[in-house]
Structure formats: C-alpha cells, structure tokens
C-alpha cells in the first residue's frame, strides 16, 4: 500500500495523475494521502470522493489504528488528517511517494520515511534536500522518477516484489542511521568556536 503525501495546490493534479480511483477499484493499492497543511484536509477528501473513492480519515480511527476500524478497512483511500504522526503514516505504508518532489517545490525530508523502513519514490525536484536525495538514491534507499505517473508504477512494482521491497526498506534504515546524527556532529564541530566566543576569545 503506497503512501502518497499530497502538497499545496498540486493535490488535484496528483490525484488525477495517479488514477487513484481506477487503481483503488482494481484493489492494486490503497492510497494514504497526507496533505501538508490542515486547511487542505477537506479539499483533498472532496477531490478523492469526486473520483468515486470512499475515504476514511485518520481522526476517525481508534488509537490502535486502521486495523480496528471497519470504516477504514472498507475504504478505498485513507486521509492523514492529523499533525505529528508522519511516523505512523510511514509505518502503515509500503512505499512513500514524496509529493513535494513532483513539482518545483524543493522536495521533502526523505530521512524520516527511510528511518521508518519505508522505501521512497521521489520526483525530479529535490533541491531543498539535494545531498540527502542523491545519497539515498545512490544507496538504494530512494528511487527517482520523472513524474507522478511513473512514481505510482514504480511504487506498484516494489509492492509486488517482496524481495526488492525488503531490500529497499533495509537500505532506507541503514541510510537513515548514517545520516540522522548530522546535526549533532555539526554542533560538536562548532563547539570549540562557540566556547571561544562565550569566553570572549
């Protein structure tokens, strides 16, 4: 079940480009759509429902998650309409489609998905996270495609290939472990200079 975060004004474009209604009808996957901004929750639900999808929102699930919600299990698509739960969403997903990388928005932090063992499929626009995106791609933790249509097909191929999916998930975990401590290492390197400044040096 791929995860497809949808960002900003591109929500409608993404939903249409992915043919979510057709794919959901074929039970090929269940999209979990996570808008970046709360004010887009209702709009994204309306867009999905306009394509004939039955939508279940995270806020309606019990604390245990969708597995204990009949509504969620019967839905064609899930909508992540809560804040601070990306780890939950990535944990539920088989593959992450980074919505912000399919338009010139600069991409998203893919280390969070990788740390959850969720393979990443990203588009061409990752200039805000260029180094991380290039490293993840080189290490097999992320796959880059030209557009969202290709992204959905790449995600489906991974979902249908358990060995490739497991390999990508392990690569993501290893990539995240190597890169998670970057801030701490930077602060440690700067500490002598900060100490000198505080001492008036």
Predicted regions and their residues:
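Nucleotide-activated sugar donor-binding and catalytic core shared by glycosyltransferases
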Residues: 1-201
């Amino acid at each position: 079940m791929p995860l497809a975060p949808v960002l900003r004004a591109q929500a409608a474009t993404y939903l249409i480009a992915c043919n979510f209604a057709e794919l959901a009808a074929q039970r090929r996957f269940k999209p979990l759509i996570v808008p970046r901004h709360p004010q887009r929750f209702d709009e994204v639900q309306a867009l999905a429902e306009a394509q004939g999808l039955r939508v279940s929102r995270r806020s309606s699930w019990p604390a245990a998650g969708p597995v204990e919600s009949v509504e969620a299990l019967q839905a064609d698509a899930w909508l992540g309409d809560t804040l601070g739960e990306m780890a939950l969403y990535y944990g539920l997903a088989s593959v992450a489609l980074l919505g912000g990388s399919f338009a010139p928005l600069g991409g998203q932090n893919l280390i969070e998905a990788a740390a959850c063992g969720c393979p990443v499929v990203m588009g061409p626009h990752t200039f805000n996270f260029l180094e991380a995106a290039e490293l993840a791609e080189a290490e097999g933790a992320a796959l880059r495609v030209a557009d969202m249509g290709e992204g959905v097909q790449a995600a489906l191929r991974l979902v249908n290939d358990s060995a490739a999916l497991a390999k990508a998930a392990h690569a993501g975990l290893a990539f995240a472990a190597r890169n998670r401590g970057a801030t701490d290492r930077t602060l440690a390197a700067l500490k002598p200079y900060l100490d000198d400044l505080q001492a008036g040096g």
